[in-house]
Amino acid sequence: MRRHPSPKPVIILKPGDTESGRRAALSHTGALAGEQRVVDAAFRQCGIIRAAESEEAWDAAIALASLPPLRRGTVAVISDGGGHATIVCDTADRHGLAVPPLAPDTQRRLREILPARSGVGNPIDFAGQAEEEPEVVPRVADVCLADPDIGGVIFAGHFGGYVKIATPELGLREEAAARELVDVVRGHGKPFILHTIYAGERLPVLETLAAASIPMYRSLEASAKAMAVCWRAASRPRAHEGRRRSTPDRVRVDAILSQATPGTPRLLLEPDARELLAAYGVNVPVFRVAATAETITHAAGDLHARLAIKLVAPELVHKSEAGGVLLDVAPEKAADAYRQLAARAASIGIAKPRVLLTPMVSHGLETVVGAFRDPQFGPVVMFGLGGIDVEAIADVTFRLAPLDETEARAMLSEIRAYRLLGAHRGRAPRDTEAAVDLIVRVSELMADLDDVAELDINPVFLLERGTAIADARAVLSAR
């Protein structure tokens, strides 16, 4: 579906959010298991609408089969009760819809229809007027649907059943209002969804609306979710562009992969992981590797900068936690730093330690770019906030590899800390295009190299110009 996006919406009922649900899924042939964030990312990337429950899938199908496309992700919420409107607005917001203030001209027109006590900013509150004068329902819907900044309208309340709480004469007026509402909705060609507590009952008004394919829901939340589904369907991704940024030398790449440590797991230690990234055109900061106090002195002199110096050994996956990293080391102190790290290595059984030294990076936003192979979806790329607390913060997003620039930019916008990438508190914006370039190249690496099971680049300092990779490692698949 990434290569050939469907012109028709696709809904998949995918349960399994709980551990017990995943266990049950695994007990059936052909069950689709997998880490839920990866499933959600894959479906979103392919334009698939995911439903966690059968009723949710049914509600989505009704909306998509009945409604015209939602051209804007903005809705007006009309209600004959403030509580109803609040729930609809909250649910709409949580599912990616905006409920913006209506244009001044739209509000003026609404004030001409509704009593002074009514709210007209969005949501619109009838304040009891519709139960006395049902004709206001199609008139207000007409005004809201005519607003060019509004994509669709959700009505929440008791419409369709006013006859049950009033006189038969009011019921006849409500039926006439329903027929007028049908004409209004058809005339504007925008989605209109009705929430009513009487949904499912055999009432004349509701039968009129059903005959006109206006979807009706008894649940406030379902009404808002149904409109959100229309927006997701309208925002389906286009085909993956397929253009590459990287042109790696495969002979060089194979030589780098051959440096993996023996045993299980097979590790590509930081120097080789950096070389692998460089082979894919990633801008890797200059570094040197040394194995003695003498060689580190020469290497430090070449770099002409204060240094980060790190032990390189398969036993040290998390070097900082093991005391295997020294920061902000003056070049003339490099030999002392080596001896300190060598003593630390000896204390944990590493006899002939190597160290990597690279210029310090003391500024920039710490991010992470990672990748792994999902058993269901294949290579997956991750981006988010990085650093030593990356797992605790868990502000990350995922995409299937390979991906293009548009998909990579979308990843940046999905993390909770997205605003930190822009200008913030007097600080210049980060170079997001450099982050996009890194994400795309990593995705191409993962799509090319089946041998690479995991790749962890953390932290990646996102600078005002460019990126600076501070650490990298890879795990290769077992042979």
Q: Which residues are covered by each model-predicted region?
A:
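Catalytic-core regions of core metabolic enzymes
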Residues: M1-R479
